[in-house]
Amino acid sequence: VKNGVLEAVNPFTIYAQGIIPAATFLTSYPLGLRNPHEWDVFYYSLGGLDIARELYAAQGMHFVGPVHHGPNIIHSKVPIRSIDDFAGRKMRLPGGMVAEVFTQIGAETTVLPGSEIFPALEKGTIDVADYVGPAVNYALGFSQVTDYIVMGPPGFMSLYQPVDLMDITVGQAAWDALSPQMKQFVEMETHVYSDMHHAAIQKADQEAW
């Protein structure tokens, strides 16, 4: 999108941290906001959307808005009964702050695309893997190569990323070419898409459990 190859994208926001380090704080992070409505307040009432748009504009992109996904879970080939049990484990993580936290507790972290996680677990290249929620991870076969799932504190599925956020981002030139009415329509539809996507993911996760 930045280079104009695509006009728009619907990514997981955390992966923008490679070119926009502050994007780490535009999605769920360790000890950050824990519920979808808290992120809505951040974006739409406390200036978060303006911050995101300023950061993305500097890279030639327009941040339309956040899209709620769901919590991440961690799959493991070995039992993890305390934070100390991550020490020495080879662990797939998305990088950035998340990886730094687990590195501090002794894990050997690596970044892998989703398509490479199953074979890495199967071959024993990694012991532990974070990806997304139960539905997607089940579909990718993680339950076939791991025996344990690491979850968060009571009431929260995820240990560190209870609200994984996606977004709608449009190249600045493509956004500028839209009429004011179409821009408003896209912004409104992003709200609707966020609600519908989040509900669909929660349903799929419940069925996967």
Question: What are these model-predicted stretches?
Answer:
Residues 2-39, 47-209:
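N-terminal secretory/targeting leader peptides
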